[in-house]
């Protein structure tokens, strides 16, 4: 009987020690803490699907196909990336060519997803995004979510 008590006490000590180590390292009980330590973006932008449904659908589809949901702002390279992403997609009367990731993102350019969408939706969305990113410096990583 004494042996059983000693085994039980040792087992309790091991469990308490393991839990203490886990709490100190942040491995247990805290998925949020672990996420914040590995966060790969600086800001979050909730894109309004009710205002720009075609653009929102394109962004969502492109992300689901494996394109980045994070945009690293790099305004200086935007024109070159726009040329790269649109070079094999001819213009089409009555439509704009929407790119995801956007040309202003380092992740954009060659291999970006390009869809034909209405000019009003595309240009409205571009203005909306541009206005909200104005104060962010180049190098800022923005996570896009669709609302």
Swiss-Prot record:
Top enzyme category: hydrolase
Pfam families on file: DNase_NucA_NucB
Cofactor(s) the record lists: Mn(2+)
Major localization listed first in the record, in broad terms: membrane
Claim: Transmembrane helix is one of the keywords in the record: yes
EC nos: 3.-.-.-
Cofactor binding note from Swiss-Prot or TrEMBL: Mn(2+) ion stimulates activity.
Highest rank taxon of the organism: Bacteria
TM helices/strands, residue ranges: 8-24
Localization per record: Cell membrane
Record keyword Transmembrane present: yes
Signal sequence residues: none
Regulation (activators, inhibitors): The activity can be inhibited by the 18 kDa competence-specific protein nin.
Region of interest called Disordered, as start-end residue ranges on this chain: 75-100
Keyword set, alphabetical order: Cell membrane, Competence, Hydrolase, Manganese, Membrane, Nuclease, Transmembrane, Transmembrane helix
Molecular function terms from GO: nuclease activity
A Gene Ontology cellular-component term: plasma membrane
Recorded topology in the membrane: Single-pass membrane protein
Family: To B.subtilis NucB.
Known function: By degrading DNA that enters the cell, plays a role in the competence of cells to be transformed. Degrades both double-stranded, linear and covalently closed circular DNA.
Assembly, per entry: This protein is a subunit of a 75 kDa protein complex, which governs binding and entry of donor DNA. The complex is a tetramer of two subunits of the DNA-entry nuclease and two subunits of a competence-specific protein. Only the complex is able to bind ds- and ss-DNA.
Protein name, per record: DNA-entry nuclease
Native source species: Bacillus subtilis (strain 168)
